[in-house]
Amino acid sequence: MQVTQGDDVVGGLTKDDFVVLDENQPQPIVSFEHGDEPVNLLLLFDISGSMQKYIEQIAQTARVALDHLRPADRVAIMVFAKKTAVHQDFSDNLAESARQIGGAVKNWDVGTTTMINTAIVDAARYMQEHAGPGGRRAILILTDNLSTSFQLTDGQVIRELDKADTVLNAIVTGRAIRPDLPGPRMFPNPDYTPSNVFHLAEETGGEWVKAAQADQTFAQMIERIRTRYMLVYHEPPSQPGTFRHITVKLSNEAQKKYPSAQVHARTGYYAQ
């Protein structure tokens, strides 16, 4: 979870500055952390033709960007277009991870079209299988968001991210425009719904940013992922598989101090 005011991250908040509602019922916070837990970060790079220059920009400053991480943090790298491939397994060797980013667009035959939702689901499942217990989990996708949701709705993607306990963050390059959320008549065939990483990031409590230059934005997003808040409360009894809605907001006192603050938190979860 992240709290921002304008373009700035709001730091220094405590457990008492937050209110958590589960199906509109207040929940006591039993654990609170701010940037202390190790992070498992999966970098998910769109390597379709139009994206190569942006990955090259990131590669030039990758070592500085990954300096925002800590020694216990781990990084994995996946690439995608039509298919998805693991470029680097999870590693705590951050210098090597930075070096590997430069080669992420080479030696991979992942097709020519772009399947964003499929790639995010593959990344979520990889995270669930390989991240290991403990720590926070985050995916950072770099894409131009030019794709359709073939055979995978946003709801299905969000469910996979929820199962993997993973937050999606996005750097969206180029001239991509955020699509409207589909209404009942807008896209009669869900296979041709435009991809919407903006919506996916927001629903999982992540952040997105549009960027003409990817290198500086990459470093900023890494830092913001590293300094997120983590709140824990006990799940109320409910039928397994039921979707439960969550609202996280600042307390009245915190709202007075930060009147224009925005809380970026997941909007719900599926009961276990």
PLM features: residue spans?
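Scaffold/interface architecture of coatomer-like assemblies
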Residues: 1-272
